[in-house]
Amino acid sequence: LVILAIFLCVAFYELLGICVAYKKQPEVSNTTKKETKNGSWNECSENTERAVIIEKNPEALLQRVRLIKNAKKEIILSTFAFQSDESGKLILGALHDAADRGVHIRLLVDGMESWIDMEGNPYFYGLSSHENVEIKLYNKANPLKPWKMMGRMHDKYLIADGKRYILGGRNTYNYFLGDFPGHKNYDRDVLVVCDEPEKENSVNQLSEYFETIWNQEDSGYFHNNKKLANRKSVKNAVLELQNSYQKYFEENKERICETDYTDETFETEKITLVSNPIHTGSKEPVVWYQLGELMKNAKNRVKIHTPYIICNDMMYNTWEEIAENVSDFSIMTNSVANNGNPFGSADYAKNRNRILSTGINIWEYEGGYSYHGKSILIDDDLSVIGSFNMDMRSAYLDTELMLVIRSKDINKQLEEGMMEYEKVSRQILEGGTYNDPYHVEPIELTKKRQRKIFLVQHLLGWARYLF
């Protein structure tokens, strides 16, 4: 009984700390409103940055390895989750190879996910103990400070030599990278290249953002101990990384060694980085507001892709305003049965009619694997791609990054990529009926999933702002 009492007290302390700290959702400040009104995405000048969207998981892995292999001075990698599965080991091997060449590596990982995937892991110790590598964790998991627990870093990007980068929604493991057996998530990234960056270019915006979050007090070092390299398990892990990476490199050598991106990228007029605050508390919804204003000013079309929809009244109101101004306003998300997130699935099932009432057209993806893409298509010249989900967690709790790209070529590429998924979706109508122009076979909603949804809705629905 004593142990049970202690457990209940600790659980109550954790729950109370989390709920009190994150219950209040800040409003948009006048400063943000003013900055958004004068948004730099409206400024067009001669831009030297070129870009291309990365749609497929195997290509996403190869392009990351390519950036790392050809880096000469510095590599920056920031990711929400990093696992030591097949694709994760290939990235670790590529980073270790770069460090051996004298390239300075800085790796930043979310402190909750790293506690699960990296602690006690010799593959990560093999990298952290290298003299040319620094690894930091954002907001390390600390049960004694539950009021900081939900502030997570959701960013995903890789920068090479301050000239080229990949940014998007993919984490660093098999679900998102490569083509390995097992579960998959579909997502997208943007590759941006600029051989001679100007001060206002997005690569410099991203580098400055990284320096700010890297140097803030909530980012602390991960096992910065060079003696770890002497452990037998670490030595064996490093050898395995080197062998697996070398095999992958030899199989893809021609493409990895190609350093001219001109023929595979498109010109852009402007690329702008949009970001949330980086502290660990409840955040001002900067990204939500700025994206909302962008969409309100569309001339005739807004198309959103998101894995989850968990909104409050402020967010619903934003969509109502967009629907009043834009004739073609739609969103595609996972169906209840196809959603890999039980919280997102349960909330969508409960609030689907409320979403429809805003005036937005909803398409439900039925592709079998959970769709994880986070993108917005605006008219025929604006594309928005990054890590931001259409939910309260992305709006108020997590660090998030989205790229606003002004380019008709990128817009066309994004439209084609979106359409590939929409052809495996159905439009939900009021009353629960469907418009099914593509004759899609829906995923079965199993009894087991129905029970999960019921439990989440009735036991955890009050905490929907945390999921």
Locate each region found by the language model.
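Charged, low-complexity intrinsically disordered terminal segments
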Residues: 1-133, 143-154, 160, 164-467
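Extended, Lys/Arg-enriched charged tracts that mediate electrostatic binding to polyanionic substrates
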Residues: 136
